[in-house]
UniProtKB/Swiss-Prot annotation:
Signal among keywords: yes
Gene3D superfamilies assigned to the protein according to its UniProt record, in alphabetical order: Allene oxide cyclase-like
Keyword match Secreted: yes
Compartment annotation: Secreted, Extracellular space, Apoplast
Family per similarity comment: Belongs to the plant dirigent protein family.
Protein's gene: DIR25
One cellular-component annotation, GO: apoplast
Name of the protein in question: Dirigent protein 25
Amino acid sequence: MAGCKVLFFLILALAITFVSAARLLDEEEDIGLVPLPTTSPGPLPTVGLGPFPTANSGPATGIASGTGSASGGLGSLGTNTGPGPLSTTGSSLLPVASSGTLPVTGPGPLPTSSGLLPGASSGNLPGSGSGPLPTVGSGAAATGLGAGAGSVIGGSVPDNTLVFFMHDILGGSNPTARAVTGVVANAALSGQIPFAKPNGANLPVSNGVPSDNNNNGILNNNNVPLLVGLGGTTSNILQNNGNNMLNGLPVANGGQLPSGSSLQMLMFGTLTVMDNELTEGHELGSGLLGKAQGFYVASALDGTSQTMAFTAMFESGGYEDSISFFGVHRTAASESHLGVMGGTGKYVNARGFAIVKTFTGSSGTQQQQPHQFTDGLETVLECTVYLSY
């Protein structure tokens, strides 16, 4: 009896297995009979029926913007399921190839979307042909991608140029510079030593020491300006005790100078200390900017250059703002260059250079110049300073 039950269950299990397998096979055959969607009932999109979507053609309502029709059929395509044609978007236009302009980088702008696409921009993209390219040094910010509010590289730089006029006055009633060493310390030329050179003078009967050695005091602080000023050696016009006058001006003759000497060689090594005024214009009476204190030395045998070292102190900062200069001023050249050696106040750690130009002229009433308002010899230096920090 037990054996019959086991045999019955085995037969039942086999029957169920066969039935299930047959059902699975029937389902697979049914799935395979479902027809694939084809495009035969409806015409496919054709080539050449509309222009390719370009920039600025209007707002896009589908995947992309375009002006041509999606297909050449008689009716609009619908959304079908099953054996019908492929499903398409009803109201939007499909991008199809056409005879229109291809979106390439060239004379036209890159195609951009004016719709609400992520990252869309109404400005010109960098690299578009007809739009403005973000260039260096144009001064205008880019209008497309990457535009910022900062300044463009290569724009204008801050102006650190400073211009002032220095008035150097030697001699006269109010000199601002004085020669302290060199030729003015030569007692033989200043008439301080008797018999500085043999001149045939006879001793006085009173056994006194003769004070006149026939040089008539060639050099003093009133005629040295004609030789050692910042304007350079101008002439051999000197001042004496009233002898050798020419047109009201004293003249030195060859017998008044030591043998083998020239005016330029006599001035070599002369050091002049200065405390000159700095003004806004070339006139001495123009706006006062400050003071220039320092010295210059006649450093050329031919008298054509002065080695200068001075500090320009400006009144606006209570004379706390200053710039120091050092260099060679060539009086025979149209302009010279001095180096900026530093500064104080707002000019601390200043670097750069100065271009120096000379305005010269005789003082007094005989050859009065527009920039001269003194009875001494005035030399005006125009200093254009270029600074960097």
